[in-house]
From Swiss-Prot:
Organism annotation: Cupriavidus pinatubonensis (strain JMP 134 / LMG 1197)
Database matches in SUPFAM superfamilies: FlhC-like (SSF160930)
Main location: cytoplasm
Job description of the protein: Functions in complex with FlhD as a master transcriptional regulator that regulates transcription of several flagellar and non-flagellar operons by binding to their promoter region. Activates expression of class 2 flagellar genes, including fliA, which is a flagellum-specific sigma factor that turns on the class 3 genes. Also regulates genes whose products function in a variety of physiological pathways.
GO cellular component: cytoplasm
Protein name: Flagellar transcriptional regulator FlhC
Known partners and oligomeric status: Heterohexamer composed of two FlhC and four FlhD subunits. Each FlhC binds a FlhD dimer, forming a heterotrimer, and a hexamer assembles by dimerization of two heterotrimers.
Binding site residues for Zn(2+): 144, 147, 164, 167
Alphabetic keyword roster: Activator, Bacterial flagellum biogenesis, Cytoplasm, DNA-binding, Metal-binding, Transcription, Transcription regulation, Zinc
UniProt remark on cofactor binding: Binds 1 zinc ion per subunit.
Organism lineage: Bacteria, Pseudomonadati, Pseudomonadota, Betaproteobacteria, Burkholderiales
Necessary cofactors: Zn(2+)
Keyword Cytoplasm appears in the UniProt entry: yes
Subcellular location: Cytoplasm
GO molecular function terms noted in the UniProt entry: DNA binding; zinc ion binding
């Protein structure tokens, strides 16, 4: 009895082009190949080839960032809180779905940091991981009862015990602030700081409220 081999369905040329363009955008913002593979249907070999062609080098080895605790430490928390607030805006107000909201949010963050001659504390891969942590119920945006700002916290953290890192910065930060002028927060955003005077945050350029 003659048998015929089943052939895989032909891949759409339009889908292939769309995935390739998305992969290029992701890699351009610094996404590691594992992130790209999770967002597109391109083969691993093609993703890695694109990465090498676009960056001129091999991707970093090792696992993706996996610590949710890192996002609630002082400086990362300020950056993460802003990024997540922009991401929420992109989804709810701009109507951007999924990875498009992540891409546009990170572009806003990166452009602002560049305009202030500062480096991005949070890489695109870390931001992508942050969004996954929130979607998985590990982290969330919580409102500080002191200033009304919204900050990244562990999910289901009792709000009665939560005070943001701007209202109650670590002691080492308070000592540093006494030695510095508070010019870094002269234009701190109402979306983050609420109605109280800003606390100096070295290394983080403040952004206008969205």
């Amino acid at each position: 009895m003659k048998t015929t081999a089943q052939t895989a369905p032909a891949r759409s040329a339009l889908q292939d082009a769309s995935d390739t363009q998305l992969a290029i955008e992701l890699i351009g913002l610094g996404a590691r190949p594992q992130v790209v593979e999770a967002e597109v249907t391109l083969s691993r070999s093609r993703v890695y080839r694109l990465y090498r062609e676009l960056t001129g080098g091999s991707p970093p080895k090792g696992m993706l960032p996996f610590s949710a605790d890192w996002f609630v430490t002082w400086r990362p928390n300020a950056h993460a809180s802003y990024l997540l607030s922009v991401h929420e805006y992109m989804q709810q107000r701009a109507g951007l779905p999924g990875i498009r909201a992540v891409l546009n949010s990170y572009r806003v963050y990166a452009e602002h940091m560049k305009a202030n001659n500062e480096e991005c504390l949070i890489s695109f891969t870390r931001f992508w991981t942050l969004v996954r942590f929130c979607e998985g119920g590990l982290l969330q945006l919580s409102t500080c009862p002191c200033c009304g700002g919204r900050f990244v916290t562990h999910a289901h953290e009792p709000l009665a015990s939560f005070i943001c890192t701007l209202c109650q910065p670590p002691s080492r930060v308070r000592r540093s602030v006494r030695r510095e002028t508070p010019h870094a927060t002269a234009n701190a955003p109402a979306a983050v700081l609420g109605n109280r005077p800003p606390v100096a945050m070295p290394g983080f350029g403040m952004v206008p409220a969205l």
